Design a protein with these regions (language model features):
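G-domain G4 guanine-recognition motif of GTPases
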Residues: 42-43, 67, 71, 144-145, ...
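Generic alpha-helical hydrophobic packing signal
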Residues: 65, 116-117, 163, 209, ...
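Conserved C-terminal guanine-recognition region of P-loop GTPase G domains, centered on the G4
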Residues: 129-136, 143-194
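Canonical P-loop GTPase G-domain recognition
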Residues: 172-229
């Protein structure tokens, strides 16, 4: 019992320290007028593919930077750098999530005054990422049609904390036989207050709604308004 209490106390201390650092990140981001978006999902849900399209299509409209978290390799960072955006790769080693201290270190690689939007592509994980505030304004959860209709019910904490849930790879919906009404219902059950979008980075379907959402949230940041209403 003593050991269990010690573990709980250590975890609470770690999360408390992370919360302090996240608050400092948030203060710094707001001083620069930045909209910061934390993108989370399981591996393979399409985070990098969506960011590739976003960087291409919003070039000249928003100044975008990206921080990419992975256990190993800089593959995703190189893909995004090819789109002309400033990108910093965060290699976490064995850590299954990003934390506020990693973001603070990565911030030093950017000229934040030259950015409008900062995307944080979190490590592909549906559990740990939900617990760590990074200083972001918005939490976006991606969920592909290939993952099964009940994914939101199996991992409710992540979905419950989302401001926006994006159903990705909708061009594959018919091929995989997914029950889209069930997908929507399960998202709504776990994330009743979240906005829901459906899109395909491959075909382009639904991307305009994503871009409109981003631009509206950026306007709110610059005007000091609340997000994701």
């Amino acid at each position: 019992m003593e050991t269990r209490r010690w573990v709980v106390e250590v975890n609470q201390a770690l999360l408390g320290k992370n919360t302090e650092l996240a608050a400092r990140n948030r203060e710094r981001f707001r001083a620069h007028g930045l909209l910061v978006v934390n993108i989370m999902s399981a591996p393979g849900s399409g985070k990098t593919a969506l960011l590739e399209r976003t960087l291409n299509d919003l070039r000249g409209k928003l100044r975008i930077g990206v921080q990419v978290g992975d256990l190993q390799t800089d593959n995703d960072a190189r893909r995004l750098s090819d789109r002309g955006a400033p990108v910093v790769q965060i290699v976490t080693g064995g850590c299954c999530h990003l934390d506020a201290s990693m973001i603070a270190q990565a911030n030093e690689k950017f000229d934040l005054d030259q950015l409008d939007v900062l995307f944080i592509e979190n490590v592909g994980n549906l559990v740990c990422t939900a617990s760590y505030d990074l200083g972001e304004d918005l939490r976006v959860v991606l969920f592909s049609v290939t993952e099964g209709e009940d994914k939101p019910l199996k991992y409710p904490v992540l979905f419950r904390k989302a401001d926006l849930v994006i159903v990705t790879k909708i061009d594959l919906a018919e091929a995989v036989g997914v029950d889209m009404p069930a997908v929507r219902e399960n998202i709504r059950r776990t994330a009743p207050d979240a906005t829901i979008l459906e899109l395909s980075a491959r075909s382009g379907d639904g991307l305009d709604a994503w871009y409109e959402f981003l631009c509206e949230q950026f306007r709110r940041e610059r005007n000091g308004q609340d997000f994701a209403d």
